[in-house]
């Protein structure tokens, strides 16, 4: 019998954290965060990082594992995450992958290949200079010409991954997206139970807007001031995260606070839309609509599925 793994995905602000804690308590689980911002130390408010109080003594993995100045790839996440899963299984507990970063989830639950060994430093430097001179959208549009799937899947602000996709195509002549295509993509040693929380779009957007306001009230600006004092700049991968880059623009007097807050809200809403598009393309996902099912019903369904299958 295959080892069970529970995946709980969904867009930002849909309510994954609270449900995941309740599930871990019911199913004797430990949580592995699949969130591309919660990996960073010192970046708590803008990433909506789960607090010690919210954890309620449930072990969490893949949170606060790298410093803001460090580069961190999906391959890095896979390497560390696989070790964490083995540790959880060794304790005879249920591994629970919780988050909204689809690439991170797939790295642990799919037959994913990374092409990190092939590099062209000269071409990469050239692309970096293009992005610096013309903006991230410029190199992102270059990707459209050679790899429509990667163009659609990779956000323009994920400059590192956009450049990697262009680099891989130049080296191999094959689209970056083709490395993980094929019938064996979803083949895994685990029995994956994959659930995605959804709700009415307008309700979700309202929750997102309110959460951004709460982040500002809770000290996001002060958090960014401290990060800036420590020498972290907007050019770093971590500082490209929604909420951080906008406040840094404000602190650099490039935009007003009003503009920064509205950009964070718009960016978060757009991100939620992209997340849902990602999950809808995955045939493994069972969607649980919070407008149709109560929190108690959702909890009960997942617990029953895991327990009885």
From Swiss-Prot:
Statement: the UniProt record of this protein carries the keyword ATP-binding: yes
Domain of life from the UniProt record: Bacteria
Known EC number: 2.5.1.75
GO biological process: tRNA modification
Chain positions recorded as substrate binding sites: 12-17
InterPro entries, per database record: Dimethylallyltransferase, IPT, P-loop_NTPase
Catalytic reaction(s) noted: adenosine(37) in tRNA + dimethylallyl diphosphate = N(6)-dimethylallyladenosine(37) in tRNA + diphosphate
Cofactor(s) recorded in Swiss-Prot or TrEMBL: Mg(2+)
Enzyme class: transferase
Function: Catalyzes the transfer of a dimethylallyl group onto the adenine at position 37 in tRNAs that read codons beginning with uridine, leading to the formation of N6-(dimethylallyl)adenosine (i(6)A).
Subunit structure, as described in the record: Monomer.
UniProt name for this protein: tRNA dimethylallyltransferase
